[in-house]
């Protein structure tokens, strides 16, 4: 989910809320989200002919398949700043399970353009990267929609499994133009439970006090270069054009 809070209620088409005191007392919550993210990445890579080969390789190396794919992308790109450009000819509309926000249409379906007669690990890596980028562009769409209704979101405080994947995090920063703040403690639910415990025990009087004392930023990931920004601006136009074409059909 993509959650933002404000002192005033904001009604945003395609975004859930506003909900009063849902996260913090006396604040209003809006929540946007995508219908499938991690599940979409898994679906794309597990559907590829090379999946079992790379999964076996990953297990033999004591790694996850995502680590193997990330290493392959780095090798293909040569430089970390060039990874994003590997998919200049591949684009994905990530609505494989409909769209939750901001289009709010569960009947939508996904699409991939740029496929070839290829069964190589490199082709699987490209599809994996293009999926991450499509999800990141979906996040950009949600942020833009929320910013048009009073928010000024320029920073994402990230949590969840995706934060453990450096390419997932970097491409979200690149696609959205936002700084990605990664928490020092990766298990957000456990930390939140501990904060509630300290308030119940009287250690802190308010949630903001507990949050300030117990939550720390471990790492900040920022957008890479202006060249990458321009590239993602073009991919974002394609993202919307694919949807418009989809609606024609």
Feature names for model-found ranges:
Residues 1-159, 164-249:
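Active-site core segments that coordinate phosphate-bearing ligands/cofactors
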């Amino acid at each position: 989910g993509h959650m933002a809070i404000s002192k005033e209620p904001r009604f945003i088409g395609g975004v859930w809320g506003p909900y009063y005191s849902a996260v913090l007392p006396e604040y209003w919550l809006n929540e946007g989200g995508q219908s499938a993210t991690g599940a979409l990445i898994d679906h794309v890579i597990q559907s590829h002919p090379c999946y079992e080969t790379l999964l076996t390789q990953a297990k033999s190396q004591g790694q996850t398949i995502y680590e193997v794919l990330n290493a392959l992308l780095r090798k293909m790109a040569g430089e970390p700043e060039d990874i994003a450009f590997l998919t200049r000819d591949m684009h994905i509309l990530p609505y494989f399970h409909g769209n939750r926000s901001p289009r709010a249409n569960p009947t939508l379906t996904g699409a991939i353009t740029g496929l070839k007669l290829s069964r190589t690990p490199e082709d699987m890596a490209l599809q994996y990267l293009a999926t991450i980028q499509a999800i990141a562009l979906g996040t950009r769409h949600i942020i833009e929609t929320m910013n048009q209704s009073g928010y000024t979101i320029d920073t994402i405080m990230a949590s969840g499994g995706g934060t453990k994947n450096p390419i997932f995090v970097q491409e979200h920063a690149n696609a959205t133009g936002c700084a990605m703040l990664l928490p020092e403690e990766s298990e957000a639910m456990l930390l939140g439970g501990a904060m509630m415990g300290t308030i119940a025990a009287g250690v802190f009087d308010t949630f903001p006090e507990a949050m300030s004392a117990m939550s720390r930023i471990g790492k900040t990931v920022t957008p890479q270069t202006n060249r990458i920004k321009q590239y993602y601006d073009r991919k974002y136009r394609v993202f919307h054009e694919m949807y418009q074409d989809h609606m024609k059909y």
